[in-house]
């Protein structure tokens, strides 16, 4: 059935022949004046944009966030201003280490990025399906990427590189334990929790600040894959999580998550046993219980994957009044890295791409000072109005009513060794290990041994030592699974 759409060039000229190039005679060479061939091939040569350095393989969908509980005592953010208020949103889930062609069912951390189109601007909440991370200083970001990506000589993923890096950082054990557990391979994106991971802050209309962590709990139930199940799925379908999410939404089986916060006062933070801004640790729910905030569902698939998912740009600098940052060093590092990566990948005007536009405010109502740059098209480039400040016509006036409360800091600017401040690497992973059933613990041992195939004895000993310091049974179990005599491991080396 024809839709009667006639082929044109990019600039609207009719195309007379889609299949046959212009040649000098029926068997002669091409001629350069075949403008449609040149246009088509030149565009094709540039179709692929740089993939994300991490989180390259992803899936996304649009949805709606609904406030279900009053938290205005903590925040003045308009998105949370009243129970029942709804805000449009976009979510992108991803694997982390693999490239765009990687399989969805690999053992890996999963990215969990949310964009809320609030009436005060876009709010991006960028996190993972784990509440912690491998380290707590952003200077190690590039090294993590190199360690989990392809080896520069073999161009293959290297267990040795991966585990050598992880085990060189004793604080990584918490994240590694989660990754080697059943939750290391979610069945699909619909069946996993999400976390903002970092510590953020909220402040209310009185300027009172609290520290918060965000949690998103799946309403579909947690479901994970065992390695043999994952291997069978990968053999048949490398897009298993994408397919599951897309088909569920197409079938109107809309996935839902409930959002919660943990709240810590500034006084509690000052007296907290550990650094409350340390991304390698959690806040125990018994001390800081979950407070329900809202629920969101994903109910619309993108019409075009490239336009909406591949070009979606998230950055933790996209916040709204009532929500702010914290001294979390990893968050501080991401404040630069994410936006800078998007400017490289998509261009300085990526905010004009439909999925990134501040829809809750309305593009016609924004007044950015930035002008020009490649592909500036959306807002008439601010027209012929004033393009400097200060000025006499009132353009680009500040909005002082949105000033944030001050944050008291102390100490000299210095490259402090965080290990001198906190070397409590093993308490939380040990506690996590003991929360597992015996069967779950055995699977951690087996998964660890499988993933460590090809690593040196030095690296294996290092990991066994860390596990033993978290819990002696943890270390013994990993040693047994690796076929290592634990008596050969020096368990007394200080990490």
From Swiss-Prot:
Catalysed reaction equations from the record: 2 H2O2 = O2 + 2 H2O
**If you read the UniProt record, what top EC class would you report for this enzyme, in one word?**
oxidoreductase
Protein name (database record): Catalase B
- List residues binding heme: 338
Name the cofactor(s) required for activity, per the record: heme
Q: Give Gene Ontology CC terms.
A: cytoplasm
Q: According to the UniProt entry, what is the EC number of this protein?
A: 1.11.1.6
Gene Ontology molecular function terms on file: catalase activity; heme binding; metal ion binding
State the organism of origin: Staphylococcus xylosus
Q: Which family does it belong to?
A: Belongs to the catalase family.
- Some GO term, biological process aspect, for this entry: which one? hydrogen peroxide catabolic process
Q: Which UniProt keywords apply?
A: Heme, Hydrogen peroxide, Iron, Metal-binding, Oxidoreductase, Peroxidase
Q: What does this protein do?
A: Decomposes hydrogen peroxide into water and oxygen; serves to protect cells from the toxic effects of hydrogen peroxide.
CDD domains the record matches: catalase_clade_3
Q: Name one Pfam family in it.
A: Catalase
Q: Which InterPro entries match?
A: Catalase, Catalase_3, Catalase_AS, Catalase_clade1/3, Catalase_core, Catalase_haem_BS, Catalase_immune_responsive, Catalase_sf
Annotated region (Disordered), positions in chain: 1-25
């Amino acid at each position: 059935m024809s839709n009667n759409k006639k082929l044109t060039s990019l600039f609207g000229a009719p195309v007379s022949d889609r299949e046959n190039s212009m040649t000098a005679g029926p068997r002669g060479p091409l001629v350069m004046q075949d403008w449609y061939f040149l246009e088509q091939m030149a565009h094709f040569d540039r179709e692929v944009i740089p993939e994300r350095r991490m989180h390259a393989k992803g899936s996304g969908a649009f949805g709606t966030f609904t406030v279900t509980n009053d938290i205005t005592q903590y925040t003045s953010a308009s998105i949370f201003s009243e129970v029942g208020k709804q805000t449009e949103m976009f979510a992108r889930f991803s694997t982390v280490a693999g490239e765009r062609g990687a399989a969805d069912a690999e053992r890996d951390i999963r990215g969990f990025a949310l964009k809320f189109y609030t009436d005060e601007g876009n709010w991006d909440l960028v996190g993972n399906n784990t509440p912690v991370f491998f380290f707590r200083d952003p200077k190690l970001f590039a090294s993590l990427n190199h360690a989990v990506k392809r080896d520069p000589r073999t161009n293959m993923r290297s267990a040795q590189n991966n585990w050598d890096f992880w085990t060189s950082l004793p604080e990584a054990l918490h994240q590694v334990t989660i990754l080697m557990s059943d939750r290391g391979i979610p069945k699909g994106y619909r069946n996993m929790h999400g976390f903002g991971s970092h510590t953020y802050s909220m402040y209310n209309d009185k300027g009172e600040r609290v520290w918060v962590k965000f949690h998103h709990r799946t309403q579909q139930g947690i479901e994970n894959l065992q390695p043999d199940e994952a291997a069978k799925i990968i053999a048949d379908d490398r897009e298993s999580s994408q397919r599951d999410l897309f088909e569920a939404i197409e079938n109107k089986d809309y996935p839902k998550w409930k959002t919660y916060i943990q709240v810590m006062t500034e006084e509690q933070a000052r007296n907290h046993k550990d650094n409350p801004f340390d991304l390698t640790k959690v806040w125990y729910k018994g001390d800081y219980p979950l407070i329900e905030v809202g629920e969101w569902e994903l109910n619309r698939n993108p019409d075009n994957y490239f336009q909406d998912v591949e070009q979606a740009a998230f950055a933790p600098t996209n916040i709204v009044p009532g929500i702010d940052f914290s001294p979390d060093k990893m968050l501080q590092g991401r404040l630069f890295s994410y936006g800078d990566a998007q400017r490289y990948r998509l261009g300085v005007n990526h905010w004009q791409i439909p999925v990134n536009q501040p829809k809750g405010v309305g593009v016609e109502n924004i007044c950015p000072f930035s002008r020009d740059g490649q592909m500036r098209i959306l807002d008439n480039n601010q027209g012929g109005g004033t393009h400097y400040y200060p000025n006499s016509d009132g353009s680009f006036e500040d909005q002082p009513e949105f000033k944030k409360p001050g944050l008291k800091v102390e100490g000299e600017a210095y490259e402090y060794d965080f290990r001198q401040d906190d070397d409590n690497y093993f308490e939380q992973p040990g506690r996590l290990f003991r929360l597992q059933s015996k069967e779950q613990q055995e699977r951690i041992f087996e998964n660890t041994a499988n993933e460590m195939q090809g690593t040196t004895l030095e690296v294996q000993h290092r990991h066994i030592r860390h596990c033993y310091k978290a819990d002696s049974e943890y270390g013994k179990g990993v040693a047994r699974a690796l076929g290592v005599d634990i008596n050969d491991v020096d368990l007394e080396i200080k990490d």
